[in-house]
Structure formats: C-alpha cells, structure tokens
C-alpha cells in the first residue's frame, strides 16, 4: 500500500466526523521556517494596511469588518510566534486627506470576549455603553454656532473636506444657538433604517452606501437619508449625563437615546444582546464601552485610546485556516477534495473538515495549505466553503491523484493495487444506514480487516469466524462473538437492502429474487416507475458485471435472502 493510498484510507476512517464538540486551540504557530513566516507576516501586514486605507479614506473595503478583524488576529498570532510586538493597534493609517482635524480621531481597540471586557472594566468607574454604529466617521467643527467643516476621518489626523455635502444632510444642524465659541464633535454618519434588527439582517452594506453618497462630486438624494450619531465631544462637559443632554438640545438626539450607564460587565452583556436583537434606526456591529474621564483633546492621537473599547458582535463570516488537503475516493469511483482546517467554532459546532467537491472545483478555487477561507453552515450543520480571503505568499504544489481508472463498477475487491480507498468506501456504505445498517461497524473496523488481510471482497466478512474477528487488536472475545452474530443476522436482511448495500443503482425498492432481477431486459427496466432509460442502462451494466455476479453466487451459497437458487 503506497503512502497516498494510506493517507486517503486513514482520512476515510474519520471523514464522517465533520463537526465535533469540545474546546480546541486554534491560535497555533505555523510549522514554517523563520524566513517563510517573516515573508508571510510582511505580506499579510501589507494587505491589511491596504484594506485599512480603503476603509478610512474611501469609506469601504474589499473585505468585511469580520474578515479584517479575524485576519488581524491571525497577524498578531504570527507576530507573537516570532517574538514581534503587536503593532496592529498603533499602526498609523496611511492617508491623503489634506484637512487637519482640530482633535485627532483615536479609533477603538477591540475587546476579544467577556473576560477581556471584565478585565478592562476592573478599577474603572463612571462607565457607559453605546451601540457601535456602523457608518462613516467624521468630524463636525462649529465656530460661533455655525458649521464650518465636515471632515472625513481619513488617517485620523487629516481627512477630506465634505463640508459642501452638509446642507443636504438634514440630520446635521447648520447652526447651533448658544453653542460654545469653538465646538468640535466626532461621530458617525449612518444610513437611517426603519427598525433594523442586526441579528436578522446583518450589515446590509449600509456604510458603503453612505460613503458612496459622500464621495460623489454632486450631492446625492441619498444624503437626505443619512443620520448622525455623536460619540465624542473632546474638551466637552465632564459628565456623560450633561454631555448627552446638551447634545440633544443642540440637535443630536441619538446619543442621549442610546447611551446607558453600566455598573458591571453583566450590564454591558445585557445591552449588547438587547441592541443586537432590537429594532434600531441604524446598523450596528457591536457596542462601545467608554468612561467619562478623558484626556484633554490636545493629547488625543490617531491610535486607540484607553478610555473607550469596542466589543463587536460575533462574526457573521468565519475564517478558517487550511491545514491540509485530502483526496478521497467514494464507493462509486468519484473523487472528492476535503479541506482539513484548524478547528473553528461556528455556532455550537467545531469544524475540522470541509468537503468542497471535485478536483476540478478545488483547482478553480486555487486553495493551498495555509490559505484562509470563509465558512458557513449549510443544511444539517454541514460546513460550506464561501470564499478564499487570503492566500499565503509561498504556495506548495499539491498534485491530485489520477482516478481515471475508477468508476461505478470498479473495486468490489481489495485488489488490484490502488483499489483500497474505493473498496473501503464500499464497505463503509454496505454497513451504513444506506445499506445493511449493521450497528457499530464502520470505517475503523473495516480498515482493520483489510490491514490484517481478513477480507478481500465486498462480502467476504460472512466467512469470518469469531476467532478470526477476535484476532484483531482491541476486539475481545465477547465483542467478536457479538459482531459474528450481527454478520449472521445480516443474511436475513430484505433482498432490496442487500441490493442497495452492494451498490445497485436504484432509488426505489426492488422486491424480487436475484434470478428474477437478472432476467429482466433493458426495456422492462426502462418502463418501471421511477427508472427511465439512463438508469435502466446503469442497472443492466451492474447486473451483468462479472464481479457483481460473483458476489451474488457467493451470497447464494451463504443462503442470503433473495439470492438462493430456485428450481
């Protein structure tokens, strides 16, 4: 048995375990030479910087926030593997904005989970929670109550001038009576929604819609549907109560309506869950927890501050890293490609393997070990490949096996050479629910029989004695006797189940004797309900195949139901 066949067979033994429960570490260091990991870190870092620049300068990114955040986490892991410092939060954002912000935009550091939230809140007081509105960050500048600048965030220090768009955004007051002589506000321009429920509808591309309207040269009618959520008032009132009250008076009502005091992490958890489910006038992607005490505006920098933190909602898209690629040969001779991924939890299921279909489809995806893919759960919790979001710089060439000689009527025996994978798949099907449904008998048991040369064809197990079964390591006499009795009882299974177990290409029940089935002509099969000409040809090819007839002759000697010779 060659190495490739052994790899395929061993994978078949566990390929039915698609999702498993239990904790598993996913943040592991790749088994790469130091030179390669340095190259991969540099490549991923550059790509993240490009996406970040697009996000902050143009209001949209080729990837979602979920994908960006998860790849940023991966970069941190790789950097820690090399002993490099985490620069992801302090990295300046490249930008071409020409207009200086009176106060820099600090951005937000993201909390990973409830434990991180609890740790950050410890020792802090006067904390508030707000929805993290998903929109376009801006600065509003008022002189003597008059709006004089509307600036995009840009790189946090300089942004683009969108002031000419402000009159078309009714949510932005053009003049504020009794405002401070110099008023600088930072907030989010968002698409006004009617009862948007984040848990049900997700992001609906709202931020990109707003960004597109702002970036257009001529005013867009969409600007009338834009709201504003003020989340920072540098050098403003010292208490949040006073701050939100004054903002409401000045014409910014959303901040007061969606700011809540919190005493513990449990309060944050409750508000986060509530806003995730509740109908809201904007799209959100998490919550922001902030403390009242802030440094003076002159100390703010274009890096995340320590007085506010974001705790995002669970990602809608999940990234998995491809660990290996397996090629499996099914019982009908069709090859499939299964990606082995570093374990990832989606909902309540841990995903370790993803079937992506044929070799042709795998080649179209161009997936190699180390690539990062997005996964979702399809029907019955089966993982589905959605996209490839990051390809490693160094791509190892993988050659798929040549399966041209395998088909629906090949490998009813262990030999000739190369048949082991398909033969094993046939045995797994035979004992499974689609065949004879022999409880407790699966791929592992069949592989042991093959390994110890106790079985050479699809029905040879009927000749095994309890002593032969007990000779397999790990199977004692009691279990061997039980298996033997199961095998003997299988002889009394209905004839239709035996046909399906052998691979009979028929989806409807067949209730007859083997000799009767064998004598039916092609035209007789074709006229039967649910069959047709194509399926009839498949049936005749199956029945006339010498290997199948040899199996039927053997089953006749074993007095299996339906195969007995009749006079």
From Swiss-Prot:
It catalyses: NAD(+) + (deoxyribonucleotide)n-3'-hydroxyl + 5'-phospho-(deoxyribonucleotide)m = (deoxyribonucleotide)n+m + AMP + beta-nicotinamide D-nucleotide. SMART domains: LIGANc (SM00532). Disulfide bonds: none annotated. The keyword NAD applies. GO terms for biological process: DNA repair; DNA replication. CDD domains: LIGANc. It holds the Pfam family DNA_ligase_aden. The active site is at residue 132. Keywords: DNA damage, DNA repair, DNA replication, Ligase, NAD. Coiled coil: none annotated. One of its GO terms (molecular function) is DNA ligase (NAD+) activity. InterPro entries: DNA_ligase_B, DNAligase_adenylation, DNAligase_N, NA-bd_OB-fold, NAD_dep_DNA_ligaseB, NAD_DNA_ligase_OB, RuvA_2-like. It is an enzyme of class 6 (ligase). Belongs to the NAD-dependent DNA ligase family. LigB subfamily. Catalyzes the formation of phosphodiester linkages between 5'-phosphoryl and 3'-hydroxyl groups in double-stranded DNA using NAD as a coenzyme and as the energy source for the reaction. This is DNA ligase B. It comes from Yersinia pseudotuberculosis serotype O:1b (strain IP 31758). The lineage of its organism: Bacteria, Pseudomonadati, Pseudomonadota, Gammaproteobacteria, Enterobacterales. The gene is ligB.
């Amino acid at each position: 048995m060659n190495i490739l066949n052994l790899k395929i067979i061993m994978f078949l033994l566990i390929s039915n375990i698609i999702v498993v429960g239990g904790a598993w570490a996913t943040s592991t260091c790749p088994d790469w030479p130091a030179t390669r990991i340095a190259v991969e870190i540099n490549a991923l870092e550059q790509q993240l910087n490009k996406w970040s620049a697009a996000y902050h300068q143009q209001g949209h990114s080729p990837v979602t926030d979920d994908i960006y955040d998860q790849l940023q986490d991966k970069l941190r892991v790789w950097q820690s593997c090399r002993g490099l410092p985490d620069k992801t939060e302090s990295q300046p954002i490249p930008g071409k904005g020409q207009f200086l912000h009176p106060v820099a935009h600090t951005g937000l550091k993201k909390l990973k989970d409830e434990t991180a939230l609890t740790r950050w809140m410890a020792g802090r007081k006067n904390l508030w929670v707000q929805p993290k509105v998903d929109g376009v960050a801006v600065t509003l500048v008022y002189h003597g109550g008059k709006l004089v600048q509307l600036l995009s965030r840009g790189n946090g220090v300089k942004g683009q001038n969108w002031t000419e768009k402000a009159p078309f955004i009714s949510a932005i007051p053009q003049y504020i009576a009794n405002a401070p002589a110099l008023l600088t506000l930072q907030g989010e321009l968002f698409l006004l929604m009617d009862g948007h429920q984040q848990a049900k509808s997700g992001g609906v591309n709202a931020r990109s819609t707003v960004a597109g309207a702002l970036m257009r040269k001529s005013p867009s009618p969409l600007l009338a549907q834009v709201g504003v959520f003020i989340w920072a008032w540098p050098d403003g009132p010292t208490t949040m109560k006073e701050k939100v009250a004054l903002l409401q008076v000045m014409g910014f009502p959303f901040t007061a309506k969606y700011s809540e005091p919190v005493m513990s992490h449990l309060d944050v958890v409750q508000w986060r869950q509530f806003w995730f489910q509740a109908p809201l006038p904007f799209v959100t992607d998490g919550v922001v927890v902030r403390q009242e005490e802030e440094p003076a505006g002159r100390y703010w920098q274009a890096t995340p501050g320590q007085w506010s933190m974001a705790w995002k909602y669970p990602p809608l898209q999940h990234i998995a890293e491809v660990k290996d690629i397996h090629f499996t040969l099914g019982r009908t001779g069709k090859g499939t490609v299964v990606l082995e991924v570093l374990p990832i939890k989606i909902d309540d299921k841990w995903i370790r393997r993803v079937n992506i279909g044929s070799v042709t489809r795998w080649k179209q995806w161009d997936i190699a070990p180390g690539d990062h893919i997005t996964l979702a759960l399809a029907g019955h919790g089966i993982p589905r490949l959605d996209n490839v979001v990051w390809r490693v710089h160094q791509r190892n060439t993988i050659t798929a096996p040549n399966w041209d000689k395998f088909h629906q009527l090949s490998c009813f025996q262990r030999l000739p050479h190369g048949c082991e994978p398909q033969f094993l798949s046939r045995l797994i099907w035979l004992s499974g629910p689609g065949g004879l449904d022999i409880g407790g008998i699966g791929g592992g048991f069949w592989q042991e029989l093959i390994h110890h040369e106790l079985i050479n064809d699809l029905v040879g197990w009927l000749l095994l004695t309890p002593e032969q079964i007990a000779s397999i390591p790990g199977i004692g006499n009691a279990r061997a006797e039980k298996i033997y009795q199961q095998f003997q009882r299988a002889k009394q299974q209905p004839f239709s189940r035996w046909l399906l177990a052998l691979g009979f290409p028929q989806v409807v029940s067949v209730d007859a004797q083997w000799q009767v089935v064998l004598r039916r002509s092609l035209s007789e099969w074709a006229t039967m309900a649910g069959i047709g000409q194509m399926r009839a040809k498949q049936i005749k090819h199956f029945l006339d195949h010498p290997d199948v007839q040899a199996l039927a002759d053997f089953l006749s000697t074993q007095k299996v139901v339906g195969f007995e010779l009749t006079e």
